[in-house]
Amino acid sequence: MVNLKKLCVGALLATTICGMGALTQSAEAGKIEDVQARGILLVGSTGDYKPMSYLNKETGKYEGFDVEVAELLAQSLGVKVQYVPTTWKTLQADTMAGKFDIAMCGVTRTFAREQKMNMSHGYLTFGKTILCRKADAKKFTSEADLNKKSVRVMVNPGGTNEKFALSNLPNCTLLVHPQNAEIPALIAEGKADVMITETMEARRYVRDDARLAAPLLDDPFTKNHFGILMAKGDQDWLNYVNFFMEEKDMDGTLDKLEDQYIK
């Protein structure tokens, strides 16, 4: 004879377990599913970093190495890209607030960022260096040559360029300009002596402006990698982005884009 009490308890347990399973499935509907349901990959960009991600004011479109990669990432998910403007000063807060799915605009991998956010595996090797007027190139052969009150060093606010200057050049005259993309022209015009930048950016500006030089390009102050920045909380999303980047590295896509935009 069936024990009705045991049967009821068993049914209740089964219902509870099924309910928990449904909650688990709902919880597992993470960033990948959200992006695909939306049909759009939201990409945060400062739009001021040649040759990684910059807003072409003439066309109104974003261009650069990271822009191409972001488009390919979106294609792999079957969605389109929509860019969300951010700044170096607000990048961390905007990422953590979920204003976009990824930030991809020449973002340096750092311990400080990794502690608060997720960063993909690194790609492209670069380092901190300087941009100066070609006429002054022989004046700046080491970090010590920059660390003087007479040297006006210009940086954009809130990013690793400013942090480098504050940590390593305490004696220089530090000038902070809000628009990173405008600094090379200001250097060329004599509004400052040196720009703290990165090898990728310096190489591009020297190529584009004959008034500028990057005398320490082959001997940068640091060695770093870029990474794709995301809010914490979705390991599957981080895994997917890492897998995508590994595949694009393996199939030669990243090398082709490096040849196109950087070398």
Annotate the PLM regions.
Residues 40-45, 63, 143-158, 174:
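Short loop->beta-strand "edge-of-pocket" segments that line small-molecule binding or catalytic clefts
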